[in-house]
């Protein structure tokens, strides 16, 4: 019975996120948001927009989405929402958008267990090896505010920020081992980024007068988001409900902690402590995303399906799905209603607006590095340097062919192919796992 309820709720969630994408009201991928105004205004057709959405999203689905879910057994935002971005943009009407999204949700839940069982039965442990992705991804992602500072400001401010952020991690690990160092890193990094940006603009106030026309565009874009508030509130409710069912994790900073919290053999007290850590990490990450999501939403009139992502933490901490749904709807609705005020405040500081692109670039670069390093660890764990050699050969084959697989996804895809090849070699008697 529980499985059927989960399937229904997840199908409703993915159906609604696909509908939001179809209405150009909200998407998950930040890179898709800027192209949707062109679709709305008739400068681009759905096929063209859909092809762009596919190109931007498929690498994340193949690398982060599938690998994280196979490793942890938990659904994640990349696996659920990136495909619904594509389906929603491509769909010719609202009914088709909802239907295609719902079908995707059902397929994910019903196919996850068989695939997991198949992979865990293989002689070469592909799933266990993919667990090596987790530590580099989480640790690297926590540095995105710092790398954004490197991109935007001079070496002196970057050096000061680096010392503050990295020493914060050292102090937390040494004296506060019960806290999640990555969540504190993100928070301190964002405080430094906003502080440096605002200080820079205050010093150059005369050069950076507020653009009144820009504010009017902000208000015009916000009104379109508010018009879709009922749909966004439903999605916020469903996300929080799914998170409270212990089958979903919102991001890389919480998914591996929640995997431990929900695993067998963990006492209720230990589980709750881990859930609290995951919620804190998610909240800190959400704070880090406020400038990026708010500025892009105000500039494009397209919101994020999970808002500022605070609904994830709401879901983790809620006692049951009903309470989670109510709180999720309230939280994401409050975010939308506050968006105009946030936009006006951010609009006063051009450096904060400019930080959005730097944040996105920093996150992409860090994820590329982390997935490459994690994939190397995974290949070595799989079968030592035989696995490493095969994975590296596949990775550079992709490079030589002009990257048919996106650079970010290539290392993870290479490791997965390596695992398949090693299992084939085992069945032919050419390879024996150590």
Each language-model region and where it sits:
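Membrane-interface helix-loop-helix modules in multi-pass membrane proteins
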Residues: 61-83, 309-318
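Signature of multi-pass transmembrane helix bundles
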Residues: 1-53, 80-301, 311-434
């Amino acid at each position: 019975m529980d499985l059927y309820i989960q399937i229904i709720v997840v199908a409703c969630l993915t159906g609604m996120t696909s509908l939001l994408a179809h209405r150009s009201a909200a998407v998950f991928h930040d890179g898709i948001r800027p192209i949707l105004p062109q679709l709305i205004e008739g400068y681009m057709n759905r096929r063209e927009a859909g092809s762009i959405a596919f190109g931007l999203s498929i690498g994340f689905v193949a690398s982060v989405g599938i690998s994280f879910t196979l490793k942890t057994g938990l659904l994640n935002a990349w696996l659920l929402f990136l495909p619904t971005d594509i389906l929603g943009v491509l769909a010719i009407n609202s009914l088709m958008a909802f239907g295609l999204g719902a079908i995707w949700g059902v397929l994910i839940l019903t196919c996850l267990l068989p695939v997991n069982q198949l992979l865990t039965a293989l002689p070469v442990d592909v799933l266990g090896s993919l667990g090596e992705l987790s530590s580099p991804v989480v640790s690297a992602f926590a540095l995105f505010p710092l790398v954004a500072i490197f991109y935007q400001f001079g070496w002196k401010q970057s050096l000061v920020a680096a010392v503050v952020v990295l020493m914060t991690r050292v102090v937390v690990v040494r004296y506060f081992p019960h806290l999640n160092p990555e969540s504190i890193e993100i928070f301190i990094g964002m405080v430094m980024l906003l502080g440096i940006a605002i200080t820079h603009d205050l010093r150059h106030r005369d050069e950076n007068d507020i653009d009144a026309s820009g504010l009017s565009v902000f208000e015009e874009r916000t009104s379109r988001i508010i018009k879709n508030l009922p749909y966004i509130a439903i999605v916020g409710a469903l996300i929080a409900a799914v998170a409270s069912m212990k089958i979903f994790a919102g991001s890389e900073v919480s998914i591996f902690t929640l995997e431990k919290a929900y695993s067998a053999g963990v006492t209720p007290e230990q589980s709750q402590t881990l859930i609290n850590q995951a919620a804190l990490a998610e909240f800190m990450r959400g704070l880090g995303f406020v400038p990026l999501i708010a500025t892009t939403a105000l500039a494009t009139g397209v919101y994020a399906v999970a808002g500022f992502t605070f609904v994830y933490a709401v879901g983790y901490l809620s006692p049951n799905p009903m309470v989670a749904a109510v709180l999720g709807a309230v939280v994401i609705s409050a975010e939308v209603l506050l968006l105009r005020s946030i936009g006006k405040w951010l609009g006063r500081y051009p450096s904060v607006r400019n930080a959005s692109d730097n944040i996105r670039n920093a996150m992409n670069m860090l994820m590329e590095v982390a997935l490459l390093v994690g994939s190397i660890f995974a290949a070595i764990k799989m079968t030592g340097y035989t696995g490493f050699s095969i994975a590296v050969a596949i990775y550079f084959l992709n490079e030589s062919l002009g990257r048919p697989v996106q650079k970010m996804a290539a290392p993870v895809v290479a490791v997965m192919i390596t695992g398949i090849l090693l299992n084939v070699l085992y069945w032919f008697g050419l390879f024996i796992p150590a």
